[in-house]
Amino acid sequence: MLSDNEINELVSDYGTRVNEGRTIKQIIADNEIPKLVGATVLEGKVSDSVFSDSLKTSDGIPVRLMFRGNRISTHDVKRGAIPFKDQVLAQNHDYMLNLVKDTLGSSQFEVEGLLPSSTVIPAENLNLLMVENVQRMYMAESSTSTSLFQHWLKAKEEGLSEFEYAGHQIDVNSLSPNGKLPYLMDTPSTKDKVDRTIDPAYLIENGVCTAGQYQHLRNASIMAFGIVSQCLREKGMVLVDTKTEHGVNAANQIVAADELYTMDSSRFWKLTEDGSVMERDGKPVSFSKEFARGMVKDSDMQFTTEQSNEIAVRYIDGLQHLTGKAFEPDLRPRDQRIIESTNLILESLT
């Protein structure tokens, strides 16, 4: 495992270099990947997707290529770039995918020779279910408007004895900041420009998914949450909450569509030897993007180089705790990594 000093040196020495490079849209426009010329490029907050009618596997399954970036977003605002974030989350996702793919399914194709650190993900182009599937085991303190914590604070301020959250009737006095919930709660939210937490009944009534689809999604997610929780407990950590996205594949199966149990989509807290949550300055010792959210002081703030490097160190340290393995960075220029990985995928699948 890399020591704290080694991680700091890695980020300090290579941070600027690994953030350099073109977007996939620019690479395609420069005709660096001829097979993708004319394809649709969807640019997201932190990653981009590429697909087209002609981009299919040899047996006709539509392909979507997802390109992870180093961009970071909090409170629905882009805050800059974090060195190595793309590679860290790629390895984080790969590790978790191997734990839960038999339970949640996966849209990803396996490509021989593609490294776990590859920031290009080959996947089936699913019919997406327009819902963010959020599971919560603890009420983590959070500044995010859709969080259970913010809804609980509002209920307390209004003097309510109970409140409704995503279809759950909750006793205000039964909860405490960063405390464990009475049970694992499914708390879906919409996939809008500004997300909002909703009752599962809303999804069914508005045709987002069928009752059967939601039941499958909920049951599989509860099982996967348990699998990951058991793995982490053996490493002295606890899974606090997670957000996953799903879609329907060509075989009419509901499968995971995006990253699974990463530090961007989940919260992980460290445990003491007696199994209680470890605290520092009265707060849980956490491995998640919440650390970056806590650094935001105003709505339009951009992270400085020093802040970005500090966040990068936390990401790498978190990965090593989650996987129990040393972080192995790919130090090739970013453009080279993207082009070579994409060509390998296209040669293998199409």
Predicted regions and their residues:
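Catalytic activation segment of kinase domains across protein kinase-like and atypical kinase folds
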Residues: V240, T244-R293
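A long amphipathic alpha-helix within ATP-dependent nucleotide-binding catalytic cores
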Residues: C209-V240
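Active-site loop/lid in soluble adenylation, ligation, and acyl-transfer enzymes
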Residues: K25-S189, D300-T350
